Amino acid sequence: MVEPPARLVAFGNQLVQVHIALRERVEELGDALNAPDLRDLRAHCLSFCAAVTRHHTAEDDGAFPVLAREHPELRPVLDELARDHVIVSDALDALTRLVGEAGDDEAARSALRTEVDSVAALLETHFTYEERKIAAALSALTGELGAADAELVARATAVPD
């Protein structure tokens, strides 16, 4: 039996690493609510939301089509994950709006904390499900995948800056 190259085997592990990095960033976002000035929160929120959006777009446009072709039995799961991405996107849009409109008082901070906690819970549920359902399939992709498809999957499993 020919073993797949280590680079491809790492895709499932890399997905988990991406999710760990995004979990840390949402935690930092919550911590930023304690800062005396919300300007840092606004900048961090924009950066965090952009990172999640880039990751999900890379999955939807790259990794998921490759997985669907290589593992057709995963199509229903991939469709469900893509629908989750829309829900997450809507939640991130709501958070971004709230951060942009928020005053610097306790009521605003409380509303922001509720929204950040909501986004964190949504992402945790999504990430856990995604890891359970597709990480092994990502790691099972073989060296026959081809450079273009491997690059698409690599983009979706790249840890955000």
Regions found by a protein language model. Give the residues of each.
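Small-residue-biased structural context
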Residues: M1-D161
